[in-house]
Amino acid sequence: MPDRYAHCTFCGARFVPDQPWPRRCGACGETSYLNPKPVAVAVQPVGGGLLVVRRGIPPARDTLALPGGFVEAGETWQQAASRELSEEVGLRTDPEAVRLYDTISAPDGTLLIFGLFPALATPDELPPAAPDDETLGFEVLHEPRALGFDLHTRVANRYFAQVAAGL
């Protein structure tokens, strides 16, 4: 597999193959870092359940997951989580209303930021499902189950445990 980061971002010179990070360029002396891209994930309660989407793209294609995606340049994580809910579900939310629920680093170094949105009273408050290339639909889970990503499963299980405990 080709190394996407095989060249210095400052001068374009090729790094030594398999050079560890951070990488110091032998040509210009600058140091390059490989930083994680944060992912904003929406935890959207609906009538005691939890909103999930069926993924239409890899990884974890055709599995259930919490709505989410990469934070774009110029966005706060709250704006990104709100945007992802809009893109994947069609649900319009206020980024100012989202609260930090959890942050977890994935084994590959990706930082996941889970944002808790105000609960919707019933599924009737959700827009009609409109599948597209990325999302095949959505549903409301009413009990814990395995999701397409282990960290999503962990957060969903925690949410349901808190609901059961009356928290």
Across the structure, where does each feature detected by a protein language model lie?
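Extended, polar beta-sheet/loop recognition surfaces of beta-rich domains
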Residues: A27-C28, Q44-G47, P95
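Conserved Nudix-box catalytic region and its N-terminal flanking loop in Nudix hydrolases
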Residues: P45-E87
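NUDIX/MutT-family hydrolases
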Residues: P127-A161
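Active-site-adjacent beta-strand/loop module that shapes the phosphate/pyrophosphate-binding cleft
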Residues: N35, D102-P128, E139-E143, Q162
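Acidic, metal-coordinating catalytic segment for phosphate/diphosphate chemistry
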Residues: M1-V41
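A short coil-to-beta-strand element that immediately follows conserved catalytic motifs
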Residues: R92-D102
